[in-house]
Curated annotation (Swiss-Prot):
The gene is leuA. Homodimer. Catalyzes the condensation of the acetyl group of acetyl-CoA with 3-methyl-2-oxobutanoate (2-ketoisovalerate) to form 3-carboxy-3-hydroxy-4-methylpentanoate (2-isopropylmalate). Residues 393-517 are annotated as: Regulatory domain. This is 2-isopropylmalate synthase. CDD domains: DRE_TIM_IPMS. Its EC number is 2.3.3.13.
């Protein structure tokens, strides 16, 4: 193994998806996995296969599709979890099972109610059983940040002896300071020697996740567990884009250490994850925030114009931010120019059907918008890719909401080869839209979350709506996306998109149920 190579383990599809409101359906997870592969991620933690039939389906389908990245499923130190993980990743070109058990005194006493010897016995069993499915097993000492080093060494000896190749040390509650975590990693890395790769997984409860990750790398960790945009439970995880660019930019500190991440794909990956989850990075977010390469101060602007490095320590192009587009699109632009633009923006694997549908929407948009920005095009392509599976397709929407009148929505939806029209009143315009769609489709949705943002600037900016809708008590809420200059039209599209996601998932699970054991 190259001791200077930092393995990048992305857990956006597992830990990142556990962020409130960030759930993804299988098709969305596949889109993200394909982009992560393009980004050059070494290991993709595709989910927790035993958590639900939907999770199993997502992990197994990603395992079938991805060829260059190792596909991993999380599993508790429980036989059935490990079995489901093994079955889910069995078709992967490169596969891994990531199993874990808590090792901190507080977790062992209050959560597990187990002694240290019992924890070690369970850990050995988990690794040995996982090895019957895959050769590559990772073991995590949950809450390592609050665990005792002598006991962690005992656990490490046991699981390495059982066949674990990677030992992960999670700061599960984001408690450690960089100096403390660095010292812990240094001691345990030296203890492991060449027997196993030391990994870290840092949470951001004190805002130190990336700092802790970098401290670990400087002290011997050779795998970092990260997420796109820093998504994750509570305050999130170490952000892939931050850790990777810090290692690349600060060669004076990290020396010969490197990752094989294709950094010009960082921005496209960030935008895809933000679009799918509906969770936008804060404007001043490092690397991928809207203001990351913006300079408003006159002094700063003057400096950058004279010499870029006066106020920019990395080039926007290094992470895929295109600041000066050379190809301007308008209503007279043809299909060839549109294709060139989307390739320039990094969408080189768009299907012909997705391209054609996006181009038709582009022409409609160009008739209503003076200037088409790169972000407009990016959103059109992403939206089309996410909404291609259309059981129901919105054809038309007309709303009436007079100041003293009753909000009414008239909706036309295409189902198979039939156009169905109906209208309903509601407590507000949105309520009227949702009630009409429910009447047409026969499904009653419960709105769990609703977000709307302006994609670009100006009065004619595109509105991006993200909804989370529940259609039955046994399934999670499904995410839908809508894009339009008209916010209510985008809302209707997003609601129908959530329904289509629900129906698509339901159809796939009924076909794959025989694979669940």
């Amino acid at each position: 193994m190259d001791k200077n190579k930092i393995i990048v383990f992305d857990t956006t599809l597992r830990d990142g998806e556990q962020s409130p409101g960030c759930s993804m359906n299988t098709e969305e997870k596949i889109k993200v996995a394909l982009q992560l592969e393009k980004l050059g991620v070494d290991v993709i933690e595709a989910g927790f296969a035993a958590a639900s039939p939907g999770d199993f389906d997502a992990v197994s389908r990603i395992a079938q599709i991805i060829k260059n990245s190792s596909i991993c499923s999380l599993a508790r130190a429980v036989d059935n979890d490990i079995k489901q993980a093994g079955l889910a990743v069995q078709s992967a070109a490169k596969s891994r099972i990531h199993t874990f058990i808590a090792t901190s005194p507080i977790h062992m006493q209050y959560k597990l109610k187990m002694s240290g010897d019992e924890v070690i016995k369970r850990a050995i069993r988990a690794v040995e059983y996982a090895k019957t499915f895959v050769d590559d097993v990772e073991f995590s000492l949950e809450d390592a940040g609050r665990s005792e080093i002598p006991f962690m060494k005992e656990v490490m000896d046991a699981v390495i002896g059982a066949g674990a190749k990677t030992i992960n040390l999670p700061d599960t509650v984001g408690y450690r300071l960089p100096t403390e975590l660095g010292a812990m990693v240094k001691e345990l890395s030296a203890y492991a020697g060449d027997r196993a790769i030391i990994s870290v997984h840092n949470h951001n409860d004190l805002g130190l996740a990336t700092a802790n990750t970098l401290a670990a790398v400087l002290n011997g960790a050779r795998q970092i567990e990260v997420t796109i945009n820093g998504l994750g439970e509570r305050a999130g995880n170490s952000a892939l884009e931050e850790a990777v660019m810090a290692i690349k930019t600060r060669k004076d500190a990290f020396g010969d250490l490197y990752t094989t991440i294709n950094t010009p794909e960082i921005y496209a990956t960030s935008r895809l994850v933000a679009t799918i989850t509906g969770v936008e990075p804060q404007q001043n977010k490092a690397i991928v925030g809207k203001n990351a390469f913006a300079h408003e101060s006159g002094i700063h602007q003057d400096g950058v114009l004279k010499h870029q490095e006066t106020y920019e320590i990395m080039k926007p192009e290094d992470v895929g931010v295109i600041k000066d587009s050379t190809l301007i699109l308008g209503k007279h632009s043809g299909r060839a120019a549109f294709r060139d633009k989307i390739v320039q923006l990094g969408f080189d694997k768009v299907s012909d059907d997705e391209l054609n549908a996006a181009f038709e929407r582009f022409k409609v948009l160009a008739d209503n918008k003076k200037e088409i920005s790169d972000e407009d095009v990016r959103m059109l392509i992403t939206d089309e890719a996410l909404n291609h599976d259309k059981t129901y397709d919105l054809i038309g929407l007309q709303i009436s909401d007079c100041t003293n009148g009753v909000p009414t929505a008239a909706v036309a939806i295409k189902y198979k080869d039939e156009i169905i029209k109906d209208a309903a009143i509601g407590d507000g315009t949105m309520d009227a839209i949702f009630k009409t769609i429910d009447r047409i489709t026969g499904f009653s949705g419960e709105l769990k979350d609703y977000k709307v943002i302006s994609v670009t600037e100006g009065k004619d900016a595109l509105a991006k709506v993200t909804t989370r809708v529940s259609f039955d008590e046994t399934s999670p809420a499904f995410v839908g996306h809508g894009l339009s200059i008209d916010t209510m039209l985008a809302t209707a599209k997003a609601y129908i998109g959530a329904l289509n996601s629900y129906l698509s998932q339901k159809k796939r699970l009924s076909k794959s149920s025989e694979h669940q054991v």
